[in-house]
Amino acid sequence: MAADTHQRGAAKTARNPVKIDLEQSGQLLRKPSWIRVRSSNSQKYLEVKRLLRENRLHTVCEEASCPNIGECFGRGTATFMILGDLCTRRCPFCDVAHGRPHAPDPDEPMHLANSIAVLKLNYVVITSVDRDDLRDGGAQHFADCIRAIRTQSPQTRIEILVPDFRGRLEVALEKLSACPPDVMNHNLETVPRLYKQCRPGADYMHSLQLLKDFKAAFPHIPTKSGLMLGLGETDEEIIEVMRDLRAHQVDMLTVGQYLQPSKGHHPVMRYVSPEDFKTFERIATNLGFSHAACGPMVRSSYHADQQAHEAGIE
């Protein structure tokens, strides 16, 4: 595979152990009235896009076709995606392209820090593709980016949304310990029964261990995770995952509706009503999460600054 090959949709998931039923995927559920995406062509939206291109930066907002991109860019916020735009995994719910990535760009931390300083952002989220090709999974690059941002914008709070560092957990946590974030986020995405189908290459217990080990090393730093509904899970399974997260000392939670990027992706199995999301939010609060954001359009980094503020991060 060429280094610049971008595989998406059916081409990306063709080699997955559990195949997507494209016939079922073609029978799309009608989107309910509460699923509404706001478009934006505001000056701030255009300014953010221009600055990203000038600095050769990627955002998960664009690469994953996030439905909230117009609102977030319009507010002058973005979730920056480091380590390129090619992922070594083939998750069928995700619209980020699969391929053989290039080597990490040594100038990316500086470009990222420059952009954040120009935009005068108070809170940023840094995420990445999975980099199974790197010995540390990309952890050193995360630390370099955090350090560069703090050098130029010491008041900016930094949340990182990391891959699972599977097979590299110990070395990854060692790298991050040199320059830890203000919030540590790693998404479980779905329930353990659906991992082989929805997260090929990942392991549910490993992801929980990542969150627990980070919390053990940095008890004062909030940990966070996110789930998508509509992949085939049951309500009872979601509640059980919430319990697992609390048992592994996770502080914050996001739960949102899965939206199918294309017919080549995993189909939407159900649309969860706003009322049911509110029920999940009440359950999460009762389980002891310091903050839980649950709603159809909630994403792990959507209004992350507000979530962090409500959880006590200034």
UniProtKB/Swiss-Prot annotation:
* Required cofactor(s): [4Fe-4S] cluster
Question: Please, which domain of life does this record's source organism belong to?
Answer: Bacteria
Q: Which InterPro entries match?
A: Aldolase_TIM, Elp3/MiaA/NifB-like_rSAM, LIAS_N, Lipoyl_synth, rSAM
Concerning CDD domains, the annotation shows:
Radical_SAM
Cofactor remark from the record: Binds 2 [4Fe-4S] clusters per subunit. One cluster is coordinated with 3 cysteines and an exchangeable S-adenosyl-L-methionine.
This protein's major location comes to cytoplasm
Taking every annotated instance into account, which residue ranges of this chain make up the domain Radical SAM core? 73-290
Q: Where in the cell is it found?
A: Cytoplasm
Q: Which reaction does it catalyse?
A: [[Fe-S] cluster scaffold protein carrying a second [4Fe-4S](2+) cluster] + N(6)-octanoyl-L-lysyl-[protein] + 2 oxidized [2Fe-2S]-[ferredoxin] + 2 S-adenosyl-L-methionine + 4 H(+) = [[Fe-S] cluster scaffold protein] + N(6)-[(R)-dihydrolipoyl]-L-lysyl-[protein] + 4 Fe(3+) + 2 hydrogen sulfide + 2 5'-deoxyadenosine + 2 L-methionine + 2 reduced [2Fe-2S]-[ferredoxin]
Q: What class of enzyme is it?
A: transferase
Residues that hold [4Fe-4S] cluster 2 according to the record:
C87, C91, C94
Give the metabolic or biological pathway. Answer: Protein modification; protein lipoylation via endogenous pathway; protein N(6)-(lipoyl)lysine from octanoyl-[acyl-carrier-protein]: step 2/2
Q: For this protein, what is any one GO molecular function term?
A: lipoate synthase activity
Task: Cite the SUPFAM superfamilies for this sequence.
Answer: Radical SAM enzymes
Q: Record-annotated residues binding [4Fe-4S] cluster 1?
A: C61, C66, C72, S301
Which EC number(s) are documented for this chain?
2.8.1.8
> One GO cellular component from the entry?
cytoplasm
UniProt keywords (A-Z) are: 4Fe-4S, Cytoplasm, Iron, Iron-sulfur, Metal-binding, S-adenosyl-L-methionine, Transferase
Family, according to the entry, reads as follows: Belongs to the radical SAM superfamily. Lipoyl synthase family.
**HAMAP family for this protein:** Lipoyl_synth
Q: What is this protein called?
A: Lipoyl synthase
Q: Which organism is it from?
A: Nitrosomonas europaea (strain ATCC 19718 / CIP 103999 / KCTC 2705 / NBRC 14298)
